[in-house]
Curated annotation (Swiss-Prot):
Belongs to the QueC family. GO terms for biological process: queuosine biosynthetic process. It catalyses: 7-carboxy-7-deazaguanine + NH4(+) + ATP = 7-cyano-7-deazaguanine + ADP + phosphate + H2O + H(+). Catalyzes the ATP-dependent conversion of 7-carboxy-7-deazaguanine (CDG) to 7-cyano-7-deazaguanine (preQ(0)). This is 7-cyano-7-deazaguanine synthase.
Amino acid sequence: MENKKKKAVVVFSGGQDSTTCLFWALKTFDEVATVTFDYGQRHAEEIECAKEIAEQLGVSFRVLDMTLLNQLTESALTREEIAVKDGENGELPSTFVPGRNQLFLSFAAVYAKQIGARHLVTGVCETDYSGYPDCRDVFIKSLNVTLNLAMDDQFVIHTPLMWLDKAETWKLADELGALDFVREKTLTCYHGIRGDGCGECPACMLRRRGLELYLAEKEGDRA
């Protein structure tokens, strides 16, 4: 495989998407490290979940302090007094944190350079997402160029989920032998509940719909 004997850094939150990407990276690269960001998210459970998953999968885990984001912007992901809701009339969801993926990938690249890794893996997706502008493919491609110019390096940002909807993301996890692991051990819920979550927030509903659709399609293929 082309990427074998290469080292990768996975931007890791312990959620469904980044955990699926971690399994993908473990199949794709020889050495994998994870980096998680503490940006003042409303449930610290996310960081603990990411740490536990990294330990179970035997990959290095590092937390970087990005709490300054909470000083610069207000979001439902960082402020408990802000309700979690989808965007309406073209507005962004209340969970959008401006600049988050740009900063996370930039700092991940600095860390990658330090440990000799040239591959960055992130779970952003433009197909079945909440409308975040920093999840778009055009942004990732632009940032990839910027990072290489800024650090005079040849980083490659991998986005295994970019063109997958949630059902297809579950399918990928299943193909990687990780469906049950992802379903039971990850944290997607905006209210900090692991596994199937609260079932009511936008993240849980998207995750559940995708899983139900994939399982129905899988059962149909068996019939």
